[in-house]
Amino acid sequence: VFVTHDHADHIKAVGHLGEKMNIPVYTTARIHEGINRSYCMTEKLSTSVRYLEKQVPMMLEDFRIESFEVPHDGTDNVGYCIEIDGKVFSFLTDLGEITPTAADYISKANYLILEANYDEEMLKMGPYPQYLKERIMSRTGHMSNSATAEFLAENITEHLRYIWLCHLSKDNNHP
């Protein structure tokens, strides 16, 4: 299991998977601290956790895996770049904007999993309180459909084969 950040919707089961099922949980030291502080963690991580350093590749059998920083309002948020047999997968969810570092990892991808969280009009007109709308639209919130589309339109590479959009809001999107 590779953890991107310490928000409840991403970590609820990692304690059980790691400690009870003996599945290694890979994360940064700071994300691990955030996980163990979280109210939603009934099973804290201890023996199953494996630490990653951002932008330092690790090998897991034939997989070369590298984490990298992405802007979001959790603790020490990361995306992942995974390479096997010359094919590169970049995974970025829960990010408020695409930084130069994130763009670099996207440019390496043959297969890209990228957030397109919300439609701006649906979010603005929807039932969320204003503070939550502002959080979502912030530079450490989430990517809008249009921001994701604009980035992709300007940055498609010849070697990019597939794109999957992820973290689509059920309340503020119409995929």
Model-derived regions: residue spans:
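Short amphipathic alpha-helical segments
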Residues: V14-H16, R37-C40, A103-D104, M125-P127
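Cap/insert and terminal regions of metallo-dependent hydrolase folds
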Residues: P100-P175
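Short, surface-exposed connector motifs at secondary-structure boundaries
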Residues: G18-N22, D85-K87, E158-W164
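Active-site metal-binding loops of divalent metal-dependent hydrolases
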Residues: D6, R30, V70-D73, T93-E97, ...
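Active-site neighborhood of divalent metal-dependent phosphoester bond hydrolases
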Residues: I31-Y51
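Core dinuclear metal-dependent hydrolase active-site scaffold
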Residues: L52-Y111
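Active-site metal-binding motif and surrounding structural segment of the metallo-beta-lactamase
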Residues: V1-T28
